[in-house]
Amino acid sequence: MVEPRDTVIREEDLNPDFLEELSELVEPVFEEEEVLSVQACYQCGTCTGSCPSGRRTSYRTRLIMRKLQLGLVDEVIKSDELWMCTTCYTCYERCPRGVKIVDAVKAARNLAAKKGYMAKAHRMVAMFVIKTGHAVPINDEIREVRKNIGLDEVPPTTHRYEEALEEVQKLVKINEFDKLIGYDWEEGDLVD
């Protein structure tokens, strides 16, 4: 069941400069025009109507875009819905205004992560990358399938080459990705 939302928008919650600030913050990854394209959204709902994730979750693309336009920073970066986008780009392909919706969502996710708001599932995937070098680590079932189709049970990746995994972990530490997701090296787990 969808929970009722607080629909009152207070003037003090608005940040009309949020898109500008967001575009400056994420410039090394996203072009300013990608984030600022959100301003062109006229709330037709095509994005929400075509979103495969929105059919199965509470994710409403149009609502995220509107909150970005209004500068409702906390509502955007603290929402679980922000992490429900699968980045399939269906919304972008169908948007009549060419709004770079997925890029704006990813930029907002970057900001959310920097401020300590990241979905547990995303943190878990990141932990798997740190521990194994893979978002989806190999398991016994996959080993068996590989063997049955004539492949080596262990693929020639970080699963086979310990030095490659060490390189991945070295990059994680250099970029402080471990701190971003709250990974404890001694415990080998996430810190909540």
UniProtKB/Swiss-Prot annotation:
<comment type="similarity">
    <text>Belongs to the HdrC family.</text>
</comment>
<keyword id="KW-0677">Repeat</keyword>
<feature type="binding site">
    <location>
        <position position="47"/>
    </location>
    <ligand>
        <name>[4Fe-4S] cluster 1</name>
    </ligand>
</feature>
<protein>
    <recommendedName>
        <fullName>CoB--CoM heterodisulfide reductase iron-sulfur subunit C</fullName>
        <ecNumber>1.8.98.-</ecNumber>
    </recommendedName>
</protein>
<dbReference type="GO" id="GO:0051912">
    <property type="term" value="F:CoB--CoM heterodisulfide reductase activity"/>
</dbReference>
<dbReference type="GO" id="GO:0015948">
    <property type="term" value="P:methanogenesis"/>
</dbReference>
<keyword id="KW-0004">4Fe-4S</keyword>
<feature type="domain" description="4Fe-4S ferredoxin-type 1">
    <location>
        <begin position="32"/>
        <end position="61"/>
    </location>
</feature>
<comment type="pathway">
    <text>Cofactor metabolism; coenzyme M-coenzyme B heterodisulfide reduction; coenzyme B and coenzyme M from coenzyme M-coenzyme B heterodisulfide: step 1/1.</text>
</comment>
<comment type="function">
    <text>Part of a complex that catalyzes the reversible reduction of CoM-S-S-CoB to the thiol-coenzymes H-S-CoM (coenzyme M) and H-S-CoB (coenzyme B).</text>
</comment>
<dbReference type="InterPro" id="IPR051460">
    <property type="entry name" value="HdrC_iron-sulfur_subunit"/>
</dbReference>
<keyword id="KW-0408">Iron</keyword>
<dbReference type="InterPro" id="IPR017680">
    <property type="entry name" value="CoB/CoM_hetero-S_Rdtase_csu"/>
</dbReference>
<keyword id="KW-0479">Metal-binding</keyword>
<dbReference type="Pfam" id="PF13183">
    <property type="entry name" value="Fer4_8"/>
</dbReference>
<dbReference type="InterPro" id="IPR009051">
    <property type="entry name" value="Helical_ferredxn"/>
</dbReference>
<dbReference type="InterPro" id="IPR017896">
    <property type="entry name" value="4Fe4S_Fe-S-bd"/>
</dbReference>
<feature type="binding site">
    <location>
        <position position="91"/>
    </location>
    <ligand>
        <name>[4Fe-4S] cluster 2</name>
    </ligand>
</feature>
<dbReference type="InterPro" id="IPR017900">
    <property type="entry name" value="4Fe4S_Fe_S_CS"/>
</dbReference>
<keyword id="KW-0560">Oxidoreductase</keyword>
<feature type="binding site">
    <location>
        <position position="51"/>
    </location>
    <ligand>
        <name>[4Fe-4S] cluster 2</name>
    </ligand>
</feature>
<feature type="domain" description="4Fe-4S ferredoxin-type 2">
    <location>
        <begin position="75"/>
        <end position="105"/>
    </location>
</feature>
<feature type="binding site">
    <location>
        <position position="44"/>
    </location>
    <ligand>
        <name>[4Fe-4S] cluster 1</name>
    </ligand>
</feature>
<feature type="binding site">
    <location>
        <position position="85"/>
    </location>
    <ligand>
        <name>[4Fe-4S] cluster 2</name>
    </ligand>
</feature>
<comment type="subunit">
    <text>The heterodisulfide reductase is composed of three subunits; HdrA, HdrB and HdrC.</text>
</comment>
<dbReference type="GO" id="GO:0051539">
    <property type="term" value="F:4 iron, 4 sulfur cluster binding"/>
</dbReference>
<feature type="binding site">
    <location>
        <position position="41"/>
    </location>
    <ligand>
        <name>[4Fe-4S] cluster 1</name>
    </ligand>
</feature>
<keyword id="KW-0411">Iron-sulfur</keyword>
<dbReference type="GO" id="GO:0005886">
    <property type="term" value="C:plasma membrane"/>
</dbReference>
<dbReference type="GO" id="GO:0046872">
    <property type="term" value="F:metal ion binding"/>
</dbReference>
<feature type="binding site">
    <location>
        <position position="88"/>
    </location>
    <ligand>
        <name>[4Fe-4S] cluster 2</name>
    </ligand>
</feature>
<keyword id="KW-0484">Methanogenesis</keyword>
<feature type="binding site">
    <location>
        <position position="95"/>
    </location>
    <ligand>
        <name>[4Fe-4S] cluster 1</name>
    </ligand>
</feature>
